[in-house]
Structure formats: structure tokens, C-alpha cells
């Protein structure tokens, strides 16, 4: 485990067993977001979060576009605790003998924020309070099959931030009129 409770981030590796179990995450509170990958297979990255509909029962795939999907073999339909997260018996992120990696995130006031929002289809958009000016933002629709978008304050250093990259494909940077982050 490599962790920093100050920044709310840990990197955890383990050897898969295909048995229901738990993995220590090294943070002092339950992670808000976990991104896990079997490093020895072509299986998709699994993303679990309190903010995905039916939290920890449904996952999203970082390298794919589907909406949140019911998958009990990833996190065993169980929310993380202050010390561990759960694994199901499937091969997706628990393949017997394979090395698995997980990136665990906690929201830290004034530093990082994991959350969700409901769009309002207005020109002004939805106001999302983070308590600070984010340097990096990920966006993924959990209800529909859309890409994962990221934007940052280096590509778009001023208001409005509308230059995006995709996390799930190799498209070049694009500028969107519908992505106007202040």
C-alpha cells in the first residue's frame, strides 16, 4: 500500500484469488472512489463510487462508455469501510494469481472532491460547489452511454474551461460549447 491520508489517495496492489474477500486501502476513512484494474488481463478498468447509482452494486468502466452497470463480482455489492474494500468472486478485478491495482480516493476539503450532480439543461448549467477552484475535472454520465471527459486548468487556463480530452479513447483534444466550466 502506498497512501497519503493528507491528500486522500492510495495505490494498492494485491494478488487475485477469485474468492470473496477484502483488501486494505490505507486511508483513514472509506474511499469515495476506487478505480481498479487486473494488470495481467484485458479486462476493463472497474470504477466504484458512492456517487454511482446503486453505489458499489453498480460499476462503470473507465476505458468504455456504458452507463453504470450492475456487477456484483467487482466490489461484492459492498461499500468500503474505513480500512478495507470488498471484492467479489469474479475474474474482473480478482483473477486468481494475477496482480491487481486499485487507486483509492477520498474527498479532502479544499484539495479534492468526489461527487455527482444532476444536469439542468439550462444555458447557465448546474452550480457545483467544491470549496476550491479545481485544477482537474472528470465527467461521466452514469445513466447513459457517453464518453469520459476530462478538463484542466492548463488546457483552459481561463473561464470558460471547454477544452477536453477523453479518458476512454484516443481522440485529440476538442473544444465543446456544452462544456463551459467556470
Mark where each language-model region is.
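Surface-exposed molecular-recognition determinants
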Residues: 1-182
Amino acid at each position: 500500500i502506498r497512501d497519503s491520508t493528507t491528500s486522500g489517495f492510495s495505490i494498492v496492489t494485491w494478488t487475485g484469488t477469485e474468492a470473496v474477500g477484502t483488501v486494505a486501502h490505507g486511508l483513514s476513512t472509506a474511499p469515495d472512489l476506487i478505480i481498479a484494474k487486473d494488470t495481467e488481463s484485458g479486462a476493463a478498468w472497474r470504477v466504484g463510487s458512492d456517487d454511482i447509482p446503486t453505489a458499489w452494486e453498480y460499476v462503470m468502466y473507465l476505458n468504455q462508455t456504458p452507463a453504470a452497470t450492475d456487477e456484483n463480482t467487482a466490489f461484492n455489492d459492498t461499500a468500503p469501510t474505513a480500512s478495507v474494500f470488498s471484492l467479489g468472486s469474479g475474474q474482473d478485478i480478482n483473477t486468481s494469481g494475477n496482480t491487481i491495482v486499485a487507486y483509492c480516493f477520498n474527498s479532502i476539503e479544499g484539495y479534492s472532491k468526489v461527487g455527482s450532480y444532476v444536469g439542468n439543461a439550462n444555458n447557465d448549467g448546474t452550480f457545483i460547489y467544491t470549496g476550491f477552484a479545481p485544477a482537474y475535472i472528470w465527467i461521466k454520465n452514469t445513466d447513459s452511454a457517453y464518453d469520459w471527459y476530462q478538463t484542466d486548468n492548463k488546457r483552459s487556463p481561463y473561464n470558460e474551461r471547454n477544452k477536453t480530452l477523453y479518458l476512454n479513447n484516443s481522440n485529440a483534444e476538442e473544444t465543446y460549447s456544452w462544456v463551459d466550466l467556470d
